UniProtKB/Swiss-Prot annotation:
Region Bacterial histone-like domain: start-end pairs: 1-90
Organism of origin: Mycobacterium leprae (strain TN)
Protein name as annotated: DNA-binding protein HupB
Residue numbers of N6-acetyllysine PTMs: 3, 72, 86, 103, 137, 144, 156
GO cellular component: cell surface; cytosol; extracellular region; nucleoid
Region (Disordered): 179-200
Amino acid sequence: MNKAELIDVLTQKLGSDRRQATAAVENVVDTIVRAVHKGDSVTITGFGVFEQRRRAARVARNPRTGETVKVKPTSVPAFRPGAQFKAVVAGAQRLPLEGPAVKRGVATSAAKKAAIKKAPVKKALAKKAATKAPAKKAVKAPAKKITTAVKVPAKKATKVVKKVAAKAPVRKATTRALAKKAAVKKAPAKKVTAAKRGRK
């Protein structure tokens, strides 16, 4: 579709003559060009955004000669299609037979639906993280209990050994004392028997 065809379609939709449709198209184009030239952007909800993009200096090649050519920084006009425009072209949104193809509020509702779809994903990730956390705690707790259980018997064992070692000398001392007493008691008996034999 060229400019003349666009004017013809606009004339039929507006129900006006060709002059008014031509003036409308030319005024819209003129307004967009002047705004973008100033550095402003023209946003048409659902349709897209006309804006100016700055390109930095770069090195390019001449396709014919193959020589490198330095390109100065320039500004170029650009157009970013809107969400509804993209949805209609992609087939995600039905194009109405009558009325405007792009309406207000449709983009906002689509954005809300996208936000609702993204939210459950975050919740699911949070639940997965919550399930992973208890597993780590369960692993750490038994490890600490095992170490304490091992340490306690070790202390008791050392105490038992010390007690046994302390008691052992007492038994030896008592046995020695009893042996000495028995020797003392036996010695006088031998002397008495020897004296009796001398008297006889």
